[in-house]
Amino acid sequence: IIFHDAEALWQLGVSESGQFMRSMAGAPGNRSIIRIGPAGANLVPTACINVDTYRHFGRLGAGAVFGSKNLKGLVICGEKDFDIKNPPEYNKLYSEIYDKATKTNLMAKYHELGTPKNVLPLNKINALPSYNLKQSNYEYADKISGEAFAEEVLARKVSCSGCPIGCVHVGGLRKLFDAGYEYEYAGVSYDHELVFSLGSQVGMKNTSDVLNLINETEEVGLDAISCGVILGFMTEALVRGDIKITDTLVELNFGETAGYLAAIRHLASPPNDFYREIGRGLYNYTRKKADGSHDYALHLGGLEMAGYFTGPAHLAGGVTGIRHSHLDNAGYSIDQKLLKDAAQLSAKTVAEKIIEEEVIRSVYTSLVICLFAREVYDLETVCRALAALDIHKTPDELKAASSKILKVKLELREKMGFKLENFPLSERYFETPSPYGLIKREFTDEILKHYGELIKNI
C-alpha cells in the first residue's frame, strides 16, 4: 500500500482527478481507479464515489465518507490469477453463459438502447415522474427517450471489465470552452435514472441539455438521482415561496439549464446554510420544516426517489429496501407485473412479492452478480458457476443463506435506529395519477404493515 499527498487534487473535478491518478499509477488495464469530486471533499452527504469514470458508488453519501477520511481516491492494481481446478468444465460453462448473454434476447435491451428504453413505455402508462411529480407523464418524453439519445448523441458503448454486453451508453457532449467557436467533446454516460432525475424531473426538452446537467453532476461528484430530485424540489419551493432567491442564489425554472448548472455547483461547494442543509437530502431538510414542504419532497425511506412512479409496490419497496435502493426488491417491476390484477390486488400479496424478490436479489448482490444479468444467472446457473470454482451449493441453500444475510442486515438497521414509521410518505405520491390511478395511502400503509409482520419470519 502506497500513500500519496492529494492536497493538489483535493478540489479538482472527477475527470481531472482521474487523469492525474492514471498518470501516477501506470499499469494500464490492470487497475481500477475510484475517486471523489468537490462534493465529497466538502463532506456533502449526497456525494458519490466515481468508479472507473462511468460507474459509481452512487448513493447514501459514500463520497462524503471518503472526504471525511481525507481520501481523494484509490488506485487498485493487480495481476494475480486464480487457478481453475477443472478448466475444461469451466470453459464449457463460460461459453454457455456467454452465448446466453450475447445470442439471446435476454440482454438485448441493455446493449441496444440501454435502460433509457424505459422512458417511453413508462410515460405511456403514467409512470414517468416529471416536474417534481406534478405529472406522471411528460410531454417531451420522445425528445429525451432512449431512441432520441441513440439517434442524436450516442457515441459509443462500454462494458465493465470482462463483460461482453456494452450496457454503458456514452453520449457526446459538445462544449464551448473559449471564444472564436472553440469546442471540445466530452463523453458522458447516461441511463434511465439520470434521464429522469436530470431530464423529466427538471423539465429538460432535449438530449444535449440532459447530458449537460449529467456532465456537471458527474464532475462535482454528486449522487445524480438525489441531485436532480433536489433540484426539482427547489424549483417548486421557489414558486411556492417556501424558499427565496437569497437561498438559492440563482433563478430556477423548469426547462432552463443555466440556473441548474449553477445550483449543482452550489450543492457540491455550499456557499450558504441553505445549500449545506438541502445537500443533506430532502428528508433531513424538510422533516423539521413547518411550511408544508414535506408534502412535495420526493424521498422514500429518507433517500430521494428513483425514476419510476409505477404504483404502491414501488413506494413500499423504496421505504423497505435493505440497501435503500429501488433495486433491492424492484417494486417498480412488481407493480407492472401485478397491474393486470389491480382490482383484486391485496396488500399482503404485494408485501410477499417484495420480500421474495429481496431474498433472491440478495443472492445476486452478495455474489456481486450484475442485476442486469439476473435472467442469465438463474439460481441453477449460479450453482453451476460456483461448482466450476469448487464451491458446491444448491438453489435452496443459496436462498437460505440469503435469508440469513438479509436478517443480519435488518438487525443492524434496527440497531442503528431505522424504523419504518419514521419515514412517512409525502402527500405528492397520493395526489398524482399512477398506472393504478390515485394510489391510496391506506393501501400503502397496509403493505408496510404486512411487510413488518412477514419479514420477522424469513
Which residue stretches match the model-derived regions?
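Extended C-terminal regions of large enzymes
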Residues: R22-L60, F66-I458
